């Protein structure tokens, strides 16, 4: 037997089990129907009805209903009883998908439920690989930035020619909804790796581009570069999505993943983002927080959509703390507080969340999972710092667990209905593991939550509206405190 034959036999022996494992994994992958039915089977209904509060939506809550209308309505009712809502998935050019979307919208409307749409595919792609969207070198040669994976990212200032096609993709489903008498109440995008983005190698590519240099006189200043790109990105979203949707449905809630009011800093990185060399940052232990341009108002969106995920790198940023949960909680609360503190109360704040450790690199060493208790406490604090509703991204197999944790907290929040829409008044994020306190104020009453990451059994105090509020330790519970019983500060 020759050497080549031996090698071939060995390779075949290795490939067979790998192929079999891959097939078995595919067979185990849950379908949308299995996901929805499992949620109904495993997640208990709310004990406090929504009655107008925002439902939970997410990446796995869309796209499927049974064929019969009556059974489909039963599914929609069962999900609503659990605080969950489906969105129709839009796929421009796919008539079958459009028919399914219209049917879902009709049934939701007949039941008095909000009609939701996930329209990300209508927003793709500005950078479609055509040379008309490329950067231009000094000699006129087109070139692309390949630091964002498979998408060919080009020149931010050569995208006007793409606007009409993107607008047409939105009109291709908006007009049929309108013609069918179905009102879209909620529309969201997850529009990420497309259009102008300043991270990865974008800055260096733009410095080489004659068009970029002409549009950004101070291109060597990263903040000037960032401002110019985010202005174009906001314009694309406003003109091609928001304004077009509002022509048909002026009262729709419209938002995009990761676009929200903030204080000028972003405390997290998406899975594809890297800080360019020489770009400014704020250090916090090993974390590098980034300056971020204000894009929510220029984009025109009508709900804020921050992202509070357990990104894999987050835990490793804070080695000074032995408390694993606080290494997660601290960063996630910074993100949620940043949005809650700066989003006007009249603007719905709908927060993306995810509990399972998010986007670990292949072959990366494991990190401690955030505990269920700490995650649910985080959700409580998000609500008490201004979040009005939740969305979730997760894998199919994670869905039931993720939703269960969220629904349990939502039910608890609904048990304090009189505080829904109340004013958040406490935004401190402790820089050491200790007592975290958040509160909503309704007239002279406070709904308070205290969560401890230390051994302090005694009360803590906070000042609200000029009064000293004493908060005893009460693990896992909220407290309602009458401000009029609290002494004035300064005495």
What are the functions of these language-model segments?
Residues 21-25:
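Boundary at the C-terminal end of the N-terminal hydrophobic targeting segment
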Residues 26-491:
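Glycan-processing catalytic domains of CAZymes
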Residues 17-18, 210:
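Short, low-complexity, intrinsically disordered N-terminal segments
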Residues 6-17:
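Bacterial N-terminal signal peptides
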